[in-house]
């Protein structure tokens, strides 16, 4: 793999990758350690890595321990002020620091960041605020703190919490926060580490899909259900200036490195237009 990886290492040195970290890779102890090792390696070869993490299961468990009921509407957590306190305590606390500790154990120099720090994530109420409460959307991303950390060789690990100018704190969807941060940083890649293998058509996973083909597959009913918003979001992110968007299964051992440093990859990469087939020296990822 090392020989295959060398062109990619040269290609991506100094570039920024935003990684949205979620799914089973956040729960399984072996996968958690492998993710930390992979992230550390990316940083060691000169890639600027920014992590945005989820943590919904941990929030639900903490709420239950505190005797608080958890309610979801269309998959989104109804968030009152008590729930915001739990989210701050859990997401920006234990979940965030556990990730930081694992990366630092491998020499990765990670730093825990909340979206509240240095006005990193400014938020606004969701259009469904009357139903969802303090669930917010990203209004603005301030990159100065992230840039400072990355330029110092550190790995920002960001809990997706934001606040508005009135001081209201909001729970923000981690996928949305990661996309907004990637656009603000003009990242080379946005990589979603989840429990989804990629875009499946029949019995195969599409390695690369362009905007026109994705629109056609949606229109024909081949891409359906929960994959549609993922695909739409990917192309909105590309339109915002991000180089490529990747969707990979974090349950595959070393999926992050395999996606970035091999010709075949393991998931689906989203591009605006299909490129001419690269040479071995140029690489595909």
From Swiss-Prot:
The organism's place on the tree of life at top rank: Bacteria
Chief location bin: cytoplasm
Family per similarity comment: Belongs to the acetylglutamate kinase family. ArgB subfamily.
Transition state stabilizer, annotated site positions: 20, 230
Catalytic activity: N-acetyl-L-glutamate + ATP = N-acetyl-L-glutamyl 5-phosphate + ADP
Pfam families recorded: AA_kinase
UniProt keyword ATP-binding, yes or no: yes
Gene Ontology terms: biological process: arginine biosynthetic process via ornithine; L-arginine biosynthetic process
Any one GO molecular-function label of the UniProt entry: ATP binding
GO CC entries: cytoplasm
Annotated EC: 2.7.2.8
SUPFAM superfamilies according to UniProt: Carbamate kinase-like (SSF53633)
Pathway the protein contributes to: Amino-acid biosynthesis; L-arginine biosynthesis; N(2)-acetyl-L-ornithine from L-glutamate: step 2/4
HAMAP family, sorted: ArgB (MF_00082)
Protein name: Acetylglutamate kinase
UniProt subcellular location: Cytoplasm
Keyword Amino-acid biosynthesis attached: yes
Organism in which the protein naturally occurs: Chlorobaculum tepidum (strain ATCC 49652 / DSM 12025 / NBRC 103806 / TLS)
């Amino acid at each position: 793999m090392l020989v295959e990886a060398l062109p990619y290492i040269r290609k991506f040195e100094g570039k920024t990758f935003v990684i949205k970290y979620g799914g089973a890779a956040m729960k399984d102890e072996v996968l958690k350690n492998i993710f930390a090792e992979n992230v550390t390696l990316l940083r060691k070869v000169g890639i600027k890595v920014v992590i945005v993490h989820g943590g919904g299961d941990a929030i639900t468990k903490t709420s239950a321990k505190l005797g608080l009921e958890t309610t979801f509407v269309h998959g989104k957590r109804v968030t009152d002020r008590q729930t915001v306190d739990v989210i701050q305590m859990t997401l920006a606390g234990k979940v965030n620091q556990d990730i930081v500790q694992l990366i630092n154990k491998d020499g990765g120099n990670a730093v825990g960041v909340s979206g509240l720090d240095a006005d990193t994530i400014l938020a606004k109420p969701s259009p469904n605020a009357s139903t969802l409460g303090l669930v917010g959307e990203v209004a603005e991303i301030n990159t100065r703190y992230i840039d400072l950390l990355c330029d110092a060789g550190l790995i920002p690990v960001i809990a997706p919490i934001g606040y508005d100018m009135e001081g209201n704190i909001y729970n923000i969807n981690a996928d949305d926060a990661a996309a907004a941060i990637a656009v603000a940083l003009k990242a080379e890649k946005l990589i979603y580490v989840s429990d989804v293998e990629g875009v499946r058509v029949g019995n195969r996973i599409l390695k690369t899909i362009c905007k026109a083909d994705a629109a056609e597959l949606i229109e024909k009913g081949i891409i359906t259900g929960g994959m549609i918003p993922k695909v739409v979001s990917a192309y909105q992110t590309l339109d915002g200036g991000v180089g490529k968007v990747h969707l990979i299964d974090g349950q595959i051992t070393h999926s992050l490195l395999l996606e970035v440093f091999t010709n075949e990859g393991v998931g689906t990469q989203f591009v605006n237009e299909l490129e001419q087939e690269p040479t071995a020296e140029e690489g595909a990822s």
